Regions:
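Short, conserved secondary-structure transition motifs
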Residues: 6-13, 201-211, 239-242
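Beta-sandwich/jelly-roll carbohydrate-recognition scaffolds of carbohydrate-active enzymes
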Residues: 1-152, 185
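Carboxylate/His-rich catalytic cores and anion/metal-binding grooves
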Residues: 106-132, 167-183, 204-238, 304
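Primarily short, surface-exposed interaction patches in extracytoplasmic proteins
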Residues: 118, 182-189, 193-198, 284
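Glycine-rich phosphate-binding loop of nucleotide-binding enzymes
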Residues: 1, 133-139, 162-169, 175-184, ...
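Active-site core of glycosidic bond-cleaving carbohydrate-active enzymes
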Residues: 147-165, 170-171, 212, 222-425
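Aromatic/His-enriched, Gly/Pro-containing loop or helix-boundary segments
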Residues: 145-152, 193-211
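A contiguous strand-loop segment
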Residues: 20-26, 32, 36-37, 47-51, ...
Length: 425
């Protein structure tokens, strides 16, 4: 009609996904001109005219669905049926303030502005993409109905397992079970837990299986709004049945990912997997699965196989047990696109990636003093790097410590384990 435009778009950037949309105007329009489609586009473009008097305001509402046009229309009818902009604005303000009020901080206005802006960023994902009837389009492009009525996506788990999801358990615990339920629904569809889910689809971006620490963290904190045995089956299956970026037969055969067999991200993939293994072991022990506990505890120690004692660096190793030579510790790589042994980093940044066994890592260095001295070198080396390919994610360099990228986020705290907590402070 002359108040509404509906459509369907298939987007193939990053993941192939479908958007059904409804655009509704509070005033009628007239199609003034129909423009031909631009290069590669299927739909024509429209120029619309609205008969607005001076001072009039045009209001526009948009609803989306991954399922169908009817889903988008139902969302608009249920969630925003009227045209009271101020009412919607005040309700949005109320809901955001409800979240912001969960944390009280002191400091300057500038510090508070930065803090609450970060808190806002925290809460804009994951996104509940289910329609009002609970339907959603899953990772296999089929339509499902969520058991809970919600389906969370935008799960960038390599980025968020370290601090974001643990913070959700504190600041928005009412959503945690729903997030895990969504991960389990993804598992039922794909046979493994989400790695990087966007609009319900699996992007296979980044490495590791970091839905595992998210689920185990919630379980150990007492969250039980999901089937615990199914959750354990999902984390165990994701750690034993090979899938993209997870070649468990190779990993178990060598005790690491050899760079001549796994030519991209071999060091980072090994280290990230050992942390996931530790998490599986923790849940196995809690559930009394002693055989699994022993198996995954052993795998969690695989990081030791890549610590080169001559350099005290995590270094690539081939299937014959030979270290990568030559070895440039400053060579940055975004290995998924350019090759190399590290993911968005270099040896200096990934050597510390043993969050689950810092004491064991210290022993490999030869004690706390040598460990702390190496940390000092990290922070005081020249802040430069030799790049291969796209490395813009590695930002905020302080020496070789990359404050702006996830693999470094825990590193400043490691002084606490070396008896020099004042350096962390």
């Amino acid at each position: 009609d002359n108040h509404t435009i509906t459509g369907h778009q298939v987007v193939e950037n990053w993941v192939k996904r479908q958007y059904y949309y409804v655009i509704s105007f509070d005033k009628p329009y007239v199609v003034r001109e129909v423009l031909p489609s631009a290069g590669g586009e299927k739909a024509k473009r429209l120029i619309l005219d609205f008969d607005l008097a001076e001072g009039d305001t045009l209001q526009v509402k948009i609803a989306l669905s991954s399922v169908c046009l009817e889903g988008a229309k139902a969302a608009l009818a249920k969630e925003n049926p009227g045209w009271d902009f101020d009412k919607i604005r005040m309700e949005a303000r109320r809901q955001w303030n409800n979240l912001f009020d969960r944390v009280k901080v002191t400091g300057s206005d500038e510090q508070k502005k930065n803090f609450y802006t970060s808190l806002y960023h925290l809460f804009i994902q994951p996104n509940d993409m289910a329609d009002t009837d609970g339907r959603y389009r899953g990772a296999d492009d089929k339509v499902y109905t969520s058991k809970t009525g919600s389906y969370y996506s935008t799960l960038s788990l390599w980025d968020t397992y370290r601090a974001t999801h643990p913070l959700y358990t504190i600041l928005s615990p009412e959503r945690v079970d729903g997030m895990i339920q969504s991960m389990l629904e993804h598992y039922r569809t794909m046979g493994y837990l989400p790695i990087w889910a966007l609009w319900g689809k699996e992007a296979h971006c980044m490495i590791g299986n970091h839905a595992i620490p998210v689920i185990v963290d919630a379980y150990l904190k007492g969250f039980r709004g999901f089937d615990v045995e199914e959750a354990y089956a999902a984390i165990r299956g994701s750690s034993t049945v090979s899938h993209q970026h997870s070649d468990w037969e190779v990993y178990d055969r060598y005790g690491y990912y050899p760079f001549d067999i796994i030519p991209k991200e071999s060091v980072s993939r090994t280290l990230e997997s050992t942390y996931d293994d530790y998490c599986v072991a923790r849940m196995a022990k809690s559930l009394g699965k002693e055989k699994d506990y022993a198996y995954f505890s052993r795998r969690a120690s695989y990081y030791k196989n890549l610590l080169d004692p001559s350099t005290t660096m995590m270094r690539g190793k081939d299937s014959k047990g030979k270290w990568r030579t030559p070895f440039n510790t400053f060579l940055l790589s975004h290995a998924a696109t350019s090759g190399g042994d590290y993911t968005e980093g270099n040896a200096w940044q990934y050597t510390w990636h043993v969050q689950h066994d810092v004491e064991g890592l210290i022993d490999l260095f030869g004690g706390k003093e040598k460990f702390a001295n190496k940390l000092v070198s990290l922070f005081f080396l020249e802040s430069s790097a030799e790049n291969t390919g796209f490395t813009q994610d590695v930002t905020g360099l302080i020496g070789q410590y990359a404050h702006g990228n996830e693999p470094s986020h825990h590193v400043a705290y490691l002084y606490n384990y070396a008896g020099q907590s004042y350096k962390t402070q």
